[in-house]
Amino acid sequence: MADPSSSGRSSTTITDLDMDTLTRCASYLSIQDISNMAVSCKILNRVAYSDSVWQSFFRQEWQNVAPLWPNGSNQSSSMREAYLFRHTALRQFKYVDPLFRHIPTVGKRPHQILFDKNTILFSQGQSIRSLHIDDLIDGNISVANRGNHKARVTCMRLFSLNDTYLYQSDSGRDDNILVTSSSDHFIRLWSKGGSRCFKGHNAPVLTLSDKLLGDDTGKCFASGGEDGTVRLWSINCTGKRGQQALKATLYGHENVVSLMSVAGHKTSLLVSISNNGKVRIWDTTTASSCIRSSCCVGMTSVPIAPVGMKCHESLLYVAAGTSVTAIDLRTMNRAFTIVQKSKIHSFEFLPSKYSLCTGGTDSALLWDMRRVSDTLKVEPKAELEGHVGHVVTGGPDDLFVNVWESDSGAQTNSLICSAPDMGGCSAMAVDGCRIVTAGDDDRVNAVLRFRDFKTATCHVSSLV
């Protein structure tokens, strides 16, 4: 039986509202919500593409910045195009007037840098140091010492507290914890509550897993080092010097364990590589210190002295010698190999662009993974020239970090990272439209250079 109170009422839907009302309501939504609206129906598609909605987004994101349209013309372009043009250009550093801060530091050049939301973390010798970005923007340059190892820091990783039981309140779920390894044989976990020490390796610890392993009930991370072992550590356990945190010691490598990565299709699988090119895959759900090598579920080999590796979905990419080899972790068969003429010194995988980049002696090469097969010889889609020396993080002998478009390989900018006649770039980190580089200031001091392009207004095209 119909509800009497509803009799006589007319049926009204969202599409009965006028365009002005809809666009005003849409201005309170996120860009993701607007994208969902665009595919729902024709009327909401018109709202999602309206200039008033995107003008609101533009003003919220970049106050006091005038819109710039592609090709410098605003006659036929929409505000949506202006927003997307600036959003993309900022992340490609296509501006010449970013907010810039010169940060001198006493001692050795930083060799690892991480962005932790609004904080910059970097290692300098045996020390872990930090900078608050809000202070930098306000012009207050103050480097804080987070803590120290007893020898050089070899690896730094950030893991989300949401994946652990270490947060004290719901507000802390979105925070990160820092895990570092060192030549002093120790691993340290740094959080707001202090630090914890993990002891187990008998030699310098060189590498840490790039992600946490396991499910919600038992998250752990892995480490590898010069003692040839892979060790699994519980992220949640406590105890003196971390003895209770050591879950398992995995044996099987006969050489230094230099790299490791967690499989993309199964978070319980860990891939480790030693300096002699031996690759081992471990199922960490069956790991036990009581049974040696029992959880090794696959082995293969690549050229010696690998310089980089990355797991994506079910494939493992390993750069070593003059080649990058892709291995299917489900079958342990080689999917394909790409080869370049010069030795590879650095490697980075860009899954969103189906691309990988290899750094050689005097240039970098950009490869399109969609064109790769094991039967055809593949040429790089772009050669990124302009560097001097080995392309590692810009080049240790190059004063500049060069910026390239990942689609075309076109150079978009060049950023100085070191003083003239000094060494080149020793480390760098990128977070959206922010970049930090490390280099030399003089013969005694190192320098960090921080650039934030968010408020930049002078596009590189205006200088042509």
Q: PLM ranges: what are they?
A:
Residues 2-15, 19-27, 31-152, 162-168, ...:
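Intrinsically disordered, low-complexity acidic/Ser/Thr/Pro-rich linker and tail segments
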Residues 3, 22, 398-399, 407-464:
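Terminal intrinsically disordered, low-complexity extensions flanking WD-repeat/beta-propeller proteins
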Residues 34, 117-121, 163-179, 195-196, ...:
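Structural hallmark of WD40 beta-propellers
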Residues 101-104, 142-148, 195-201, 240-242, ...:
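Short C-terminal beta-strands that terminate individual repeats in beta-propeller domains
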Residues 107-113, 150-170, 203-213, 254-263, ...:
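Canonical WD40 repeat/beta-propeller blade segments in eukaryotic WD-repeat proteins
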Residues 123-125, 181-184, 224-227, 273-276, ...:
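Conserved strand-to-loop turn within each blade of WD40 beta-propeller repeats
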Residues 128-134, 187-191, 230-234, 279-283, ...:
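WD40-repeat beta-propellers
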Residues 385-404:
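Loop/turn-rich, solvent-exposed surfaces of beta-rich toroidal or solenoidal domains
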